[in-house]
Protein backbone atom coordinates (compact mmCIF):
# COMPACT_ATOMS: atom_id res chain seq x y z
CA UNK A 1 0.00 0.00 0.00
CA UNK A 2 1.24 3.49 -0.87
CA UNK A 3 1.97 5.56 2.25
CA UNK A 4 2.63 9.33 2.40
CA UNK A 5 6.41 8.93 2.32
CA UNK A 6 6.19 7.67 -1.27
CA UNK A 7 4.76 11.02 -2.40
CA UNK A 8 7.53 12.81 -0.54
CA UNK A 9 10.22 10.70 -2.22
CA UNK A 10 8.71 11.33 -5.66
CA UNK A 11 8.59 15.07 -5.00
CA UNK A 12 12.16 15.32 -3.71
CA UNK A 13 13.59 13.09 -6.48
CA UNK A 14 11.81 14.99 -9.29
CA UNK A 15 13.91 15.32 -12.48
CA UNK A 16 12.96 18.98 -12.96
CA UNK A 17 13.36 21.78 -10.43
CA UNK A 18 11.04 24.81 -10.57
CA UNK A 19 11.49 28.21 -8.94
CA UNK A 20 10.02 31.68 -9.35
CA UNK A 21 12.70 34.37 -9.54
CA UNK A 22 12.08 38.04 -10.39
CA UNK A 23 8.64 37.28 -11.78
CA UNK A 24 9.88 34.50 -14.08
CA UNK A 25 9.84 30.72 -13.84
CA UNK A 26 13.33 29.26 -13.53
CA UNK A 27 13.50 25.67 -14.77
CA UNK A 28 16.46 23.37 -14.00
CA UNK A 29 16.88 20.04 -15.78
CA UNK A 30 18.16 17.56 -13.18
CA UNK A 31 18.36 14.70 -15.68
CA UNK A 32 21.84 13.48 -16.61
CA UNK A 33 21.24 12.43 -20.22
CA UNK A 34 18.03 13.90 -21.70
CA UNK A 35 16.79 17.41 -22.39
CA UNK A 36 13.27 18.66 -21.60
CA UNK A 37 11.79 18.07 -25.05
CA UNK A 38 9.91 15.04 -23.66
CA UNK A 39 7.81 17.19 -21.34
CA UNK A 40 5.03 19.77 -21.29
CA UNK A 41 4.69 22.57 -18.74
CA UNK A 42 1.15 23.12 -17.41
CA UNK A 43 -0.13 25.55 -14.80
CA UNK A 44 -3.25 26.12 -12.70
CA UNK A 45 -4.21 29.08 -10.53
CA UNK A 46 -6.37 28.37 -7.47
CA UNK A 47 -8.05 31.03 -5.36
CA UNK A 48 -9.06 29.94 -1.85
CA UNK A 49 -8.76 26.32 -2.98
CA UNK A 50 -10.87 26.61 -6.14
CA UNK A 51 -9.30 26.43 -9.60
CA UNK A 52 -9.86 29.66 -11.53
CA UNK A 53 -7.42 29.54 -14.46
CA UNK A 54 -5.27 27.01 -16.29
CA UNK A 55 -2.89 27.04 -19.20
CA UNK A 56 0.34 25.82 -20.76
CA UNK A 57 3.78 27.41 -21.08
CA UNK A 58 6.15 26.46 -23.89
CA UNK A 59 9.04 24.60 -22.31
CA UNK A 60 12.54 25.24 -23.74
CA UNK A 61 14.66 22.21 -24.65
CA UNK A 62 16.95 22.72 -21.66
CA UNK A 63 20.02 20.47 -21.73
CA UNK A 64 20.85 18.05 -18.89
CA UNK A 65 22.13 19.90 -15.83
CA UNK A 66 21.26 23.31 -17.29
CA UNK A 67 18.68 25.96 -16.36
CA UNK A 68 16.47 28.37 -18.28
CA UNK A 69 13.78 30.96 -17.57
CA UNK A 70 10.22 31.29 -18.84
CA UNK A 71 7.88 34.27 -18.56
CA UNK A 72 4.75 33.73 -16.49
CA UNK A 73 1.32 34.71 -17.84
CA UNK A 74 -0.72 37.61 -16.51
CA UNK A 75 -3.25 36.22 -14.04
CA UNK A 76 -6.77 37.67 -14.11
CA UNK A 77 -8.21 36.00 -11.01
CA UNK A 78 -6.11 37.43 -8.18
CA UNK A 79 -8.46 38.80 -5.52
CA UNK A 80 -7.64 41.00 -2.53
CA UNK A 81 -7.62 39.10 0.80
CA UNK A 82 -7.80 35.74 -1.02
CA UNK A 83 -5.23 32.94 -0.89
CA UNK A 84 -3.87 32.55 -4.43
CA UNK A 85 -1.74 29.51 -5.27
CA UNK A 86 -0.02 28.79 -8.58
CA UNK A 87 0.81 25.17 -9.38
CA UNK A 88 3.27 24.43 -12.19
CA UNK A 89 3.44 20.82 -13.45
CA UNK A 90 5.88 19.04 -15.73
CA UNK A 91 4.19 16.12 -17.51
CA UNK A 92 5.08 13.60 -20.22
CA UNK A 93 4.22 14.68 -23.77
CA UNK A 94 3.78 11.13 -25.03
CA UNK A 95 3.37 7.60 -23.75
CA UNK A 96 6.57 6.05 -22.37
CA UNK A 97 7.35 2.44 -21.50
CA UNK A 98 6.78 3.26 -17.83
CA UNK A 99 3.93 5.82 -17.90
CA UNK A 100 1.20 7.32 -20.08
CA UNK A 101 1.15 10.77 -21.66
CA UNK A 102 0.21 13.39 -19.07
CA UNK A 103 1.96 11.59 -16.21
CA UNK A 104 3.28 14.22 -13.81
CA UNK A 105 7.02 13.93 -13.15
CA UNK A 106 7.55 17.20 -11.27
CA UNK A 107 5.53 20.04 -9.80
CA UNK A 108 5.87 23.06 -7.58
CA UNK A 109 3.39 25.35 -5.87
CA UNK A 110 3.95 29.08 -5.47
CA UNK A 111 1.97 31.40 -3.21
CA UNK A 112 1.17 34.50 -5.27
CA UNK A 113 -0.88 36.09 -2.51
CA UNK A 114 -1.50 35.03 1.08
CA UNK A 115 -5.09 34.99 2.21
CA UNK A 116 -6.16 36.76 5.36
CA UNK A 117 -6.71 34.57 8.41
CA UNK A 118 -9.38 35.42 10.96
CA UNK A 119 -8.69 38.62 12.86
CA UNK A 120 -8.17 38.56 16.61
CA UNK A 121 -10.70 41.40 16.93
CA UNK A 122 -14.37 40.43 17.05
CA UNK A 123 -17.25 42.51 18.41
CA UNK A 124 -20.24 40.99 20.19
CA UNK A 125 -23.62 42.11 18.83
CA UNK A 126 -26.24 40.44 20.98
CA UNK A 127 -27.26 39.22 24.41
CA UNK A 128 -25.96 36.14 26.21
CA UNK A 129 -27.49 34.27 29.14
CA UNK A 130 -25.14 33.11 31.89
CA UNK A 131 -26.25 30.48 34.42
CA UNK A 132 -23.87 29.32 37.12
CA UNK A 133 -24.02 27.03 40.12
CA UNK A 134 -21.39 25.43 42.35
CA UNK A 135 -20.45 22.83 39.76
CA UNK A 136 -21.02 24.26 36.29
CA UNK A 137 -21.18 27.31 34.04
CA UNK A 138 -23.70 27.50 31.19
CA UNK A 139 -23.62 30.22 28.52
CA UNK A 140 -26.35 30.36 25.91
CA UNK A 141 -27.52 32.54 23.06
CA UNK A 142 -29.75 32.28 20.04
CA UNK A 143 -29.41 28.74 18.66
CA UNK A 144 -26.50 27.59 20.80
CA UNK A 145 -25.22 26.80 24.29
CA UNK A 146 -21.90 25.84 25.82
CA UNK A 147 -21.31 24.41 29.28
CA UNK A 148 -18.28 23.71 31.48
CA UNK A 149 -17.73 21.67 34.61
CA UNK A 150 -15.73 23.96 36.89
CA UNK A 151 -14.69 21.96 39.97
CA UNK A 152 -12.91 18.77 38.86
CA UNK A 153 -11.06 19.42 35.59
CA UNK A 154 -12.62 22.43 33.86
CA UNK A 155 -13.96 20.29 31.03
CA UNK A 156 -16.38 21.53 28.38
CA UNK A 157 -19.32 19.20 28.94
CA UNK A 158 -21.63 20.37 26.17
CA UNK A 159 -21.58 22.37 22.94
CA UNK A 160 -24.93 22.60 21.20
CA UNK A 161 -25.56 24.26 17.84
CA UNK A 162 -29.11 24.41 16.42
CA UNK A 163 -30.29 21.81 18.91
CA UNK A 164 -27.55 19.28 18.10
CA UNK A 165 -24.82 18.22 20.52
CA UNK A 166 -21.37 18.46 18.96
CA UNK A 167 -19.45 16.63 21.69
CA UNK A 168 -19.31 12.98 22.74
CA UNK A 169 -18.25 11.87 26.21
CA UNK A 170 -16.87 8.31 26.32
CA UNK A 171 -15.59 7.24 29.73
CA UNK A 172 -11.97 7.21 28.55
CA UNK A 173 -12.14 10.84 27.36
CA UNK A 174 -13.15 12.74 30.52
CA UNK A 175 -11.65 16.17 29.73
CA UNK A 176 -12.53 18.40 26.77
CA UNK A 177 -10.57 19.82 25.25
CA UNK A 178 -7.73 17.73 26.68
CA UNK A 179 -4.19 19.08 26.49
CA UNK A 180 -2.20 16.74 24.24
CA UNK A 181 1.56 16.60 24.72
CA UNK A 182 2.04 12.92 23.83
CA UNK A 183 1.76 11.11 20.51
CA UNK A 184 1.71 7.40 19.71
CA UNK A 185 5.40 6.79 18.86
CA UNK A 186 6.23 6.43 15.19
CA UNK A 187 8.74 3.87 13.92
CA UNK A 188 11.24 6.73 13.84
CA UNK A 189 10.44 7.67 17.45
CA UNK A 190 11.31 4.11 18.42
CA UNK A 191 14.48 4.25 16.29
CA UNK A 192 17.89 2.74 17.09
CA UNK A 193 17.73 2.12 20.83
CA UNK A 194 14.14 3.37 21.09
CA UNK A 195 15.36 6.57 22.75
CA UNK A 196 12.47 8.98 22.12
CA UNK A 197 9.71 6.51 22.95
CA UNK A 198 11.67 5.32 26.00
CA UNK A 199 12.20 8.87 27.22
CA UNK A 200 8.51 9.67 26.88
CA UNK A 201 7.51 6.59 28.86
CA UNK A 202 10.23 7.18 31.47
CA UNK A 203 8.95 10.72 32.09
CA UNK A 204 5.31 9.58 32.22
CA UNK A 205 4.32 11.50 29.10
CA UNK A 206 1.89 8.73 28.15
CA UNK A 207 -0.16 9.04 31.35
CA UNK A 208 -0.11 12.59 32.78
CA UNK A 209 -1.94 13.69 35.88
CA UNK A 210 -4.23 16.58 34.91
CA UNK A 211 -4.90 19.20 37.58
CA UNK A 212 -7.36 22.10 37.43
CA UNK A 213 -5.53 25.18 38.73
CA UNK A 214 -8.15 27.92 38.23
CA UNK A 215 -11.52 28.64 36.62
CA UNK A 216 -13.28 31.98 36.40
CA UNK A 217 -15.34 34.07 34.01
CA UNK A 218 -16.23 37.71 33.37
CA UNK A 219 -18.30 39.83 31.00
CA UNK A 220 -16.77 42.18 28.47
CA UNK A 221 -18.15 45.66 27.93
CA UNK A 222 -19.84 44.52 24.70
CA UNK A 223 -21.56 41.60 26.46
CA UNK A 224 -19.25 38.81 25.31
CA UNK A 225 -18.32 36.36 28.09
CA UNK A 226 -14.69 35.47 28.80
CA UNK A 227 -13.93 32.14 30.49
CA UNK A 228 -10.37 31.58 31.74
CA UNK A 229 -9.24 28.07 32.66
CA UNK A 230 -5.78 26.96 33.73
CA UNK A 231 -4.76 23.31 33.97
CA UNK A 232 -1.49 21.43 34.39
CA UNK A 233 -0.33 18.18 32.83
CA UNK A 234 2.00 16.74 35.48
CA UNK A 235 4.84 14.38 34.56
CA UNK A 236 7.63 12.73 36.58
CA UNK A 237 9.89 15.80 36.75
CA UNK A 238 8.13 18.49 34.77
CA UNK A 239 4.78 19.79 33.63
CA UNK A 240 2.99 21.68 30.89
CA UNK A 241 0.76 24.52 32.11
CA UNK A 242 -2.18 25.19 29.79
CA UNK A 243 -4.07 28.49 29.94
CA UNK A 244 -7.27 28.58 27.89
CA UNK A 245 -9.14 31.84 27.29
CA UNK A 246 -12.58 31.37 25.74
CA UNK A 247 -14.49 34.40 24.47
CA UNK A 248 -18.11 33.48 23.79
CA UNK A 249 -20.20 35.59 21.40
CA UNK A 250 -23.96 35.78 21.02
CA UNK A 251 -23.98 34.13 17.57
CA UNK A 252 -22.33 31.00 18.98
CA UNK A 253 -18.79 31.84 17.88
CA UNK A 254 -16.21 30.80 20.48
CA UNK A 255 -12.75 32.33 20.27
CA UNK A 256 -10.23 30.05 22.01
CA UNK A 257 -6.69 31.19 22.70
CA UNK A 258 -4.63 28.48 24.41
CA UNK A 259 -1.06 28.88 25.63
CA UNK A 260 1.19 25.98 26.58
CA UNK A 261 4.14 26.56 28.90
CA UNK A 262 6.56 23.64 29.45
CA UNK A 263 8.24 23.73 32.87
CA UNK A 264 10.80 21.59 34.69
CA UNK A 265 12.65 18.60 33.29
CA UNK A 266 10.99 17.27 30.14
CA UNK A 267 12.21 15.10 27.26
CA UNK A 268 11.83 16.05 23.59
CA UNK A 269 8.22 17.26 23.38
CA UNK A 270 6.07 15.33 20.85
CA UNK A 271 3.37 17.99 20.44
CA UNK A 272 1.59 20.88 22.14
CA UNK A 273 -2.11 21.02 21.42
CA UNK A 274 -5.66 20.13 22.37
CA UNK A 275 -8.22 17.49 21.38
CA UNK A 276 -12.01 17.33 21.34
CA UNK A 277 -14.14 14.20 21.07
CA UNK A 278 -16.97 14.86 18.61
CA UNK A 279 -20.22 13.00 18.07
CA UNK A 280 -20.08 10.19 15.44
CA UNK A 281 -22.36 11.98 12.96
CA UNK A 282 -19.68 14.54 12.03
CA UNK A 283 -17.51 12.20 10.01
CA UNK A 284 -16.76 14.25 6.89
CA UNK A 285 -13.50 16.17 7.24
CA UNK A 286 -12.79 19.23 5.10
CA UNK A 287 -9.74 21.43 5.54
CA UNK A 288 -7.85 24.21 3.80
CA UNK A 289 -4.19 23.48 4.33
CA UNK A 290 -1.61 20.93 3.25
CA UNK A 291 -2.89 17.63 1.88
CA UNK A 292 -4.33 15.40 0.77
CA UNK A 293 -1.99 12.86 2.41
CA UNK A 294 -0.83 13.35 5.98
CA UNK A 295 2.18 15.59 6.49
CA UNK A 296 4.50 16.80 9.23
CA UNK A 297 6.87 19.77 9.72
CA UNK A 298 9.76 17.91 8.08
CA UNK A 299 7.69 15.91 5.56
CA UNK A 300 5.35 18.32 3.83
CA UNK A 301 7.13 19.21 0.57
CA UNK A 302 4.82 16.86 -1.33
CA UNK A 303 1.62 18.14 0.31
CA UNK A 304 0.02 21.02 -1.57
CA UNK A 305 -1.88 23.88 0.01
CA UNK A 306 -5.47 23.34 -1.07
CA UNK A 307 -9.06 22.62 -0.12
CA UNK A 308 -9.31 18.91 0.73
CA UNK A 309 -12.19 16.67 1.74
CA UNK A 310 -12.57 13.07 2.84
CA UNK A 311 -14.13 10.81 5.42
CA UNK A 312 -12.57 10.68 8.87
CA UNK A 313 -11.93 6.96 8.31
CA UNK A 314 -9.66 7.83 5.36
CA UNK A 315 -7.34 10.02 7.42
CA UNK A 316 -5.55 7.30 9.40
CA UNK A 317 -2.62 5.57 7.67
CA UNK A 318 -2.62 1.84 8.38
CA UNK A 319 1.02 1.03 9.01
CA UNK A 320 1.67 -2.58 10.14
CA UNK A 321 2.50 -1.24 13.61
CA UNK A 322 0.00 1.40 14.82
CA UNK A 323 1.58 4.84 15.20
CA UNK A 324 0.82 8.53 14.97
CA UNK A 325 -0.54 9.56 11.57
CA UNK A 326 -3.15 11.76 9.91
CA UNK A 327 -1.56 15.10 10.79
CA UNK A 328 -2.16 18.05 8.44
CA UNK A 329 0.12 21.10 8.49
CA UNK A 330 -0.66 24.78 7.84
CA UNK A 331 -4.41 24.48 8.35
CA UNK A 332 -6.30 27.73 7.71
CA UNK A 333 -9.70 26.30 8.60
CA UNK A 334 -11.49 22.96 8.91
CA UNK A 335 -15.00 21.59 9.18
CA UNK A 336 -16.46 18.34 10.45
CA UNK A 337 -19.93 17.79 9.08
CA UNK A 338 -22.77 15.28 8.92
CA UNK A 339 -24.70 13.99 5.91
CA UNK A 340 -26.61 17.30 5.73
CA UNK A 341 -23.30 19.21 5.57
CA UNK A 342 -23.91 20.68 9.02
CA UNK A 343 -21.59 20.56 11.98
CA UNK A 344 -18.64 22.46 13.38
CA UNK A 345 -16.07 24.81 11.85
CA UNK A 346 -12.68 25.87 13.24
CA UNK A 347 -10.74 28.84 11.83
CA UNK A 348 -7.12 29.75 12.47
CA UNK A 349 -6.73 33.18 14.07
CA UNK A 350 -3.64 35.08 12.88
CA UNK A 351 -1.50 31.90 12.58
CA UNK A 352 -2.12 28.54 10.89
CA UNK A 353 -2.15 25.36 12.98
CA UNK A 354 -1.74 21.57 12.67
CA UNK A 355 -4.76 19.27 12.85
CA UNK A 356 -6.05 15.73 12.49
CA UNK A 357 -9.44 14.02 12.65
CA UNK A 358 -9.38 10.31 13.46
CA UNK A 359 -11.53 7.49 14.81
CA UNK A 360 -8.81 6.80 17.40
CA UNK A 361 -7.47 8.48 20.50
CA UNK A 362 -3.73 8.66 21.06
CA UNK A 363 -4.09 5.88 23.63
CA UNK A 364 -6.07 3.67 21.22
CA UNK A 365 -3.11 3.73 18.83
CA UNK A 366 -0.41 3.64 21.51
CA UNK A 367 -1.74 0.59 23.31
CA UNK A 368 -2.11 -1.60 20.20
CA UNK A 369 0.82 -3.38 18.55
CA UNK A 370 -0.76 -4.72 15.34
CA UNK A 371 -2.87 -2.78 12.86
CA UNK A 372 -5.21 -5.72 12.32
CA UNK A 373 -6.25 -5.46 15.98
CA UNK A 374 -6.78 -1.67 15.97
CA UNK A 375 -10.51 -1.01 16.29
CA UNK A 376 -11.94 2.38 15.26
CA UNK A 377 -14.37 4.04 17.62
CA UNK A 378 -17.51 5.75 16.35
CA UNK A 379 -16.54 9.14 17.80
CA UNK A 380 -14.20 11.59 16.06
CA UNK A 381 -11.04 12.77 17.81
CA UNK A 382 -10.26 16.27 16.55
CA UNK A 383 -6.69 17.25 17.44
CA UNK A 384 -5.35 20.78 16.91
CA UNK A 385 -1.76 21.66 17.66
CA UNK A 386 0.31 24.79 18.10
CA UNK A 387 3.47 22.72 17.55
CA UNK A 388 4.24 19.20 16.28
CA UNK A 389 7.55 17.35 16.47
CA UNK A 390 9.01 16.39 13.09
CA UNK A 391 9.44 12.75 12.10
CA UNK A 392 13.20 12.63 11.55
CA UNK A 393 14.77 9.55 10.01
CA UNK A 394 16.04 7.61 12.98
CA UNK A 395 14.46 4.28 12.07
CA UNK A 396 17.64 4.00 9.98
CA UNK A 397 19.36 7.39 10.22
CA UNK A 398 19.49 10.71 12.09
CA UNK A 399 16.82 11.97 14.46
CA UNK A 400 14.67 15.09 14.15
CA UNK A 401 16.64 18.15 13.08
CA UNK A 402 16.72 20.97 15.62
CA UNK A 403 14.64 23.30 13.44
CA UNK A 404 11.82 20.71 13.43
CA UNK A 405 11.91 20.10 17.20
CA UNK A 406 9.67 21.90 19.69
CA UNK A 407 11.38 24.57 21.76
CA UNK A 408 10.64 24.38 25.47
CA UNK A 409 9.04 27.81 25.60
CA UNK A 410 5.50 29.20 25.51
CA UNK A 411 3.48 28.25 22.43
CA UNK A 412 0.03 29.55 21.46
CA UNK A 413 -2.86 27.98 19.58
CA UNK A 414 -5.50 30.55 18.60
CA UNK A 415 -8.65 29.25 16.92
CA UNK A 416 -12.26 30.25 16.43
CA UNK A 417 -15.04 27.67 16.75
CA UNK A 418 -18.43 28.19 15.11
CA UNK A 419 -21.43 26.36 13.72
CA UNK A 420 -21.25 25.04 10.14
CA UNK A 421 -24.76 25.39 8.70
Features from the language model and the residues they span:
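Extended substrate-binding grooves/exosites of carbohydrate-active enzymes
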Residues: 1-22, 32-37, 42, 46-51
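Short, acidic/polar linear motifs in exposed loop/turn regions
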Residues: 31-35, 94, 264-265
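Beta-strand/loop-rich accessory regions of lumenal/periplasmic or secreted enzymes
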Residues: 75-82, 96, 110-421
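Short aromatic-acidic-glycine turn motif
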Residues: 44-56, 95-98, 279-288
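Short beta-strand and strand-turn-strand segments in soluble, beta-rich domains
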Residues: 38, 45-57, 103-104, 238-239, ...
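Short edge beta-strand/loop segments characteristic of extracellular beta-sandwich folds
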Residues: 24-32, 259, 416
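Intrinsically disordered, low-complexity Pro/Gly/Ser/Thr-rich segments with frequent PxxP/GP/PP motifs
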Residues: 49-84, 90, 98
Amino acid sequence: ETTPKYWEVKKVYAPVELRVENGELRVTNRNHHIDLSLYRCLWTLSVDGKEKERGEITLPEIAPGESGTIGLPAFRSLKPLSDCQLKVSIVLKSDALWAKAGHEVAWEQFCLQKGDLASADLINKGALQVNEDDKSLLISGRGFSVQWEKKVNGSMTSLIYKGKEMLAHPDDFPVQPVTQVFRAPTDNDKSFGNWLAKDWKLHGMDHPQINLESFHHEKRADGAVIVRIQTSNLYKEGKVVTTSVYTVFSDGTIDLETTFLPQGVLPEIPRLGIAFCLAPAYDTFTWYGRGAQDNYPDRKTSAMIGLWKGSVAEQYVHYPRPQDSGNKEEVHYLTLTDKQNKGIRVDAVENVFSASALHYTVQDIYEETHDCNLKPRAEIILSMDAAVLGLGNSSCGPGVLKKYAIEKKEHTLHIRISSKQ
